[in-house]
Amino acid sequence: YYLIDNEQYFKRGGTYGEYDDAERFAYFSKAVLELLPQIDFFPDIIHANDWHTALVPVYLDTQYRSLPGYGSIKTVFSIHNIEFQGKYDRNILESVFGIYPSQESILEFDGCLNLMKGAIECANIVTTVSETYAKEILNPYFSFGLHPILEARQYKLRGIVNGIDTEVFDPETDPNIKTNYSLKTRGNKRFDKLALQEELGLTQDPDVPLIGLVTRLTPQKGIDLLEPVMDELMRENVQMVVLGSGYAEYENYFKYCDYAYHDKFRAVIKFSAPLAQQIYAGADLFLMPSKSEPCGLAQMIAMRYGTIPIVHTVG
């Protein structure tokens, strides 16, 4: 393995959301291509992911294709979430991206530079994380504006379903849960439910339906779909556990629910991988009301733990 680093660009508090993201990821994309002759290795295929490395197929086609070793390289570009496209002002085309004005049309879309659009144009194959999502992003509702670009290139668009690591997410060996179980010993799942109820201060009852929700608290995840029905739901003989963080309005809403329905509702406003797996194991039902979901892993994890997903018809 070869790892590309630059402390000026990447020794930061987080991976994304920096003021100079355009420069950081342009550097990384160009460094990927500059590395190849240094290590004397020209791959058959380069796989770029999302807007952060979208410039790899663009640079390959516009600046490297004619150089020795680069001519036969093919590129695959994967879209995990089309909402995040890498949009920037046109005035940084040369100064930051190092692309000539004569080549601006590759990136230009809807009055700005759109890195994802450039990758869709230049890549040999474009993939998404499910067959359904590959169809959905041809629709204006799901494409965040890129549907005409994708419609013109349907011939190279593929949907490949995401997967989970079944060794990490395995109730038979998971060290994070109270009692391990398998298909043959699935009755032991009730002990994980009782342990989760005890951990969160809910009444321990193996028979009350326990609903779990592990998610980022963002509009995409359909949180606002729950608000109109929460009172009605909480009048039923159920318990509910929410784990996640995100938009303040949704965090505050679930904090309110924890207060208003404290005998049967718990909100843990953070992310904790061990607690997430305890919820997958301890819940009876897993709620996933996403308005848009490219593929979704949580429902796969829930099923791995024998917890029934309640989902929206997307992704």
Model-identified regions with their sequence ranges:
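Catalytic cores of nucleotide-sugar-dependent glycosyltransferases that transfer UDP/GDP/TDP-activated
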Residues: 1-315
